[in-house]
Amino acid sequence: MDNMNHEELNDQLLVRREKLHNLREQGIDPFGKRFERTNATNELLSLYGEFSKEELEEKEISVSIAGRIMTKRGKGKAGFAHIQDLHGQVQIYVRKDAVGDEEYELFKTADLGDLVGIEGKVFKTNVGELSVKATGFTLLTKSLRPLPDKYHGLKDVEQRYRQRYLDLITSMESRETFVTRSKIIREMRRYLDDNGYLEVETPMMHAIAGGASARPFITHHNALDMELYMRIAIELHLKRLIVGGLEKVYEIGRVFRNEGVSTRHNPEFTMIELYEAYADYKDIMKLTENMVAHIAKQVLGTTTIQYGDYEINLEPEWTRLHMVDAIKEHSGADFWNPMSVEEARELAKEHNVEIKDTMEVGHIINEFFEQKVEDKLIQPTFIYGHPVEISPLAKKNDEDPRFTDRFELFIVAREHANAFTELNDPIDQKERFEAQLKEREQGNDEAHMMDDDYIEALEYGMPPTGGLGIGIDRLVMLLTNAPSIRDVLLFPAMRHKQD
């Protein structure tokens, strides 16, 4: 911002402070009291929008509304303004002879951004705009800072994220996104509750970071003098509840991963995890597609949505594709025949797939998938049959134990869900954890830690179980056509602001 803009802003701040002082001198509270509304702006339009000008004059409908002044015009003894609430805007018409000298003076000196209450009669202007003719004008909150230019809004994307309150004031689209987010979560809860799932709450601070391959945030508990990890997944506590006999459970909550920030990643994000006893990953596939389709229908009214340049069909049944078949289809590489790690490395070299020296065959298969397949999965696709090496908590496939009964859901080339038939063999689980410990020793700081308490829980017996995790932020991105995760988080993680 140049010096001129600084000076203009400072002048505006001074003028508004002076108005604040004058209000107090007159005995008017610039940060007022409770105001009772009869209607929101959208209710006025739905209730009275169809009436003619003459019908409204005859009915003399009295209303009480409140909101923020977004536009204002007029001279002399009358003026117009638009006030905005959560749901939209409505025009008000203020005449000196209708509200009195004192209240008209309040209207005249009001600034854009001030919050006001209006009592009045509903009418239509000569051009047919539904409006409220004020009989009372109340200042509810004096705004001491000018709003961004109404014609341009917040063009600085970073400012939109840092000052979300300004973004919400100036962008109806942004407000609608966050209202939709709330509806998505509400419908998700409703669907699961109606299908017999029990919502639970489990700790966010763990003695051992587990349930996912990710770097944790570490904190220190002073009273207990111990290090704790902010949870990287909800999984292991929910599976303990399955052991305890809570047969269908879910939790919607925050998860924390000490990793990079991008259009798809935020260090803290919201997940739903659910677990169902006596089910497997195929049951969870059906649950996933039916639940997402239900949410889209209830919130958006359709299962056909637009995301960027793509039209996405969320109507079940979705494509199911084994990871090895997907790799063969898109790269020609065939991993169905067992091979040594040397052969897998040679295959990676032939197909220009980047790998690390420490990778086993399963890791190389996964790299093939991520580098050759993932960005081609636009329509909803369940990729199943992940290698054991990258799935330490999933049950091995009975027919080919190199792979697991696990799936990931991809839509618009992004992972949206991860699920498996849960590993309930405590001996196998301990061996998997030990293999993960070796990976940690080789430098993989995302490998799983040993969790003896969880193994002990499994030793009491966990029934065959299907489990699912869905990143709610990415689902909201999909259903609101948002290009970045920051567009669906009210207050995303940001770097320190540079002076």
Swiss-Prot record:
It is found in: Cytoplasm. One of its GO terms (cellular component) is cytosol. Its EC number is 6.1.1.6. One of its GO terms (molecular function) is catalytic activity, acting on a protein. Belongs to the class-II aminoacyl-tRNA synthetase family. The lineage of its organism: Bacteria, Bacillati, Bacillota, Bacilli, Bacillales. Homodimer. The keyword Magnesium applies. Keywords: Aminoacyl-tRNA synthetase, ATP-binding, Cytoplasm, Ligase, Magnesium, Metal-binding, Nucleotide-binding, Protein biosynthesis. This is Lysine--tRNA ligase. It catalyses: tRNA(Lys) + L-lysine + ATP = L-lysyl-tRNA(Lys) + AMP + diphosphate. Binds 3 Mg(2+) ions per subunit. It comes from the Bacteria. The keyword Repeat does not apply. Pfam families: tRNA-synt_2 (PF00152), tRNA_anti-codon (PF01336). It comes from Bacillus cereus (strain AH187).
